[in-house]
């Protein structure tokens, strides 16, 4: 029996941000990635949908170059919207050609990536008690 048959695929994590001409969002997403990396046992990359670098395809290529076989993509957005439901899946090649109703182009959407492994796309952050705790802390510090 092959000893590799029971091995799990090498996993990478891609945190996706919107991107901006201003540096603040990029700094926050990179800061979140740095915190996550401290306890992660797999490679972590950051990619941006628009206006910032690295783009989502560039980040996928970065993870692929590390030999990952499965990429878990997490949008660092609070809620679903056009970007999480249409634009990001389209960039990831997960939309099966669905057009949606969003008709402006994004700077990175025509870039390609070289990855033939599995891509798993997660939900955005959502209504999570940990986010409510952050809000409580902000309110408490402002009182």
Swiss-Prot record:
Pathway(s) the chain acts in: Cofactor biosynthesis; adenosylcobalamin biosynthesis; cob(II)yrinate a,c-diamide from sirohydrochlorin (anaerobic route): step 1/10
Binding residue positions for Ni(2+): 18, 83
Residue sites binding Co(2+) per the record: 18, 83
Xref: Pfam families: CbiX
Amino acids binding substrate: 53, 78-83
Keyword hit for Metal-binding: yes
Membrane-traversing stretches: none
Coiled coil: none
Active site (catalytic residues): 18
InterPro entries: CbiX-like, SiroHydchlorin_Cochelatase, Sirohydro_Cobaltochel/CbiX
Enzyme class: lyase
Domain of life: Archaea
Catalytic activity: Co-sirohydrochlorin + 2 H(+) = sirohydrochlorin + Co(2+); Ni-sirohydrochlorin + 2 H(+) = sirohydrochlorin + Ni(2+)
EC number, as in UniProt: 4.99.1.3, 4.99.1.11
Alphabetic keyword roster: Cobalamin biosynthesis, Cobalt, Lyase, Metal-binding, Methanogenesis, Nickel
GO biological process: one example: anaerobic cobalamin biosynthetic process
Gene Ontology MF: a single term: nickel cation binding
Family: Belongs to the CbiX family. CbiXS subfamily.
Quaternary data: Homotetramer; dimer of dimers.
Role played: Catalyzes the insertion of Co(2+) into sirohydrochlorin as part of the anaerobic pathway to cobalamin biosynthesis. Involved in the biosynthesis of the unique nickel-containing tetrapyrrole coenzyme F430, the prosthetic group of methyl-coenzyme M reductase (MCR), which plays a key role in methanogenesis and anaerobic methane oxidation (Potential). Catalyzes the insertion of Ni(2+) into sirohydrochlorin to yield Ni-sirohydrochlorin (Potential).
Protein name: Sirohydrochlorin cobaltochelatase
Gene coding for it: cbiX
